[in-house]
């Protein structure tokens, strides 16, 4: 991540106060980014988004239109955020009452969150997890989990390529060739 990258695109109708924007990042119309936010390389921040100060966005992240990312949200590399995803940062909000600290929400590497989902403060979306559209996430979602609903519940597991995994004797082989194991409620990729 460079400081005030010369190779990023900022639409003339965007307000970008931060100098911490990576190379080849595109920021479209009516986006407002506050001064302390950090945005990595090759990101795409679509129209009508707001990004607060205590926000980190990694490399190769897609932020679709209508998303507000509040203080305390940390987004790792290769994450997809569908249109109008909602992040909260205060579990017990009141007007003009400010918490000493905001809940920390982490979206891990390769995760995808479907359109109009709500991510309640303080939760972790695991690596390559997939949250279905319109879901309300009220607890952590583990790596590779496919979760959806209100509240979001684990309905299965997906490969990095997004294909649904079918476990037999706690092992799965995806059509793309990647192998996984399931043990003690945790899915992990087998490197062979």
Swiss-Prot record:
Keywords per UniProt = Transferase
SUPFAM superfamilies per UniProt: Trimeric LpxA-like enzymes (SSF51161)
Q: Which Enzyme Commission numbers does its entry carry?
A: 2.3.1.197
Keyword field contains Transport: no
Q: Which InterPro entries match?
A: Hexapep, Trans_hexapeptide_repeat, Trimer_LpxA-like_sf
Which domain of life, per UniProt?
A: Bacteria
Which reactions appear under catalytic activity for this entry? dTDP-3-amino-3,6-dideoxy-alpha-D-galactopyranose + acetyl-CoA = dTDP-3-acetamido-3,6-dideoxy-alpha-D-galactopyranose + CoA + H(+)
Q: Which Pfam families match?
A: Hexapep (PF00132), Hexapep_2 (PF14602)
Q: Which terms does the record give in the GO molecular function aspect?
A: transferase activity
According to its UniProt entry, the function of this protein is described as: Catalyzes the transfer of an acetyl group to dTDP-D-Fucp3N to form dTDP-D-Fucp3NAc in the biosynthesis of dTDP-3-acetamido-3,6-dideoxy-alpha-D-galactose, a glycan chain of the S-layer.
Q: Which family does it belong to?
A: Belongs to the transferase hexapeptide repeat family.
What is the name attached to this protein's record?
Answer: dTDP-3-amino-3,6-dideoxy-alpha-D-galactopyranose 3-N-acetyltransferase
- Say which species the protein is native to: Aneurinibacillus thermoaerophilus
């Amino acid at each position: 991540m460079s400081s005030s990258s010369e190779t990023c695109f900022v639409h003339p109708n965007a307000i970008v106060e931060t100098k911490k924007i990576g190379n080849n990042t595109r920021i479209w119309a009516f986006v407002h980014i506050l001064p302390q936010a950090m945005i990595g390389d090759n990101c795409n921040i679509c129209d009508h988004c707001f990004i607060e100060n205590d926000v980190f966005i990694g490399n190769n992240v897609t932020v679709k239109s209508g998303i507000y990312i509040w203080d305390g949200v940390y987004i790792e590399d290769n994450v997809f955020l569908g249109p109008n995803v909602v992040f909260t940062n205060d579990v017990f909000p009141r007007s003009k009452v400010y918490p000493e600290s905001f809940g920390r929400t982490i979206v891990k590497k390769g995760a995808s969150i479907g359109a109009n989902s709500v991510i309640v403060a303080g939760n972790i979306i695991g690596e390559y997890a997939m949250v279905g559209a319109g879901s309300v996430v009220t607890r952590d979602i583990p790596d590779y989990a496919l979760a959806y609903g209100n509240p979001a519940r684990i309905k299965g597991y997906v490969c990095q390529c997004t294909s649904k995994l079918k476990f037999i004797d706690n092992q799965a082989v995806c059509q793309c060739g990647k192998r996984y194991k399931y043990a003690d409620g945790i899915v992990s990729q087998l490197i062979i």
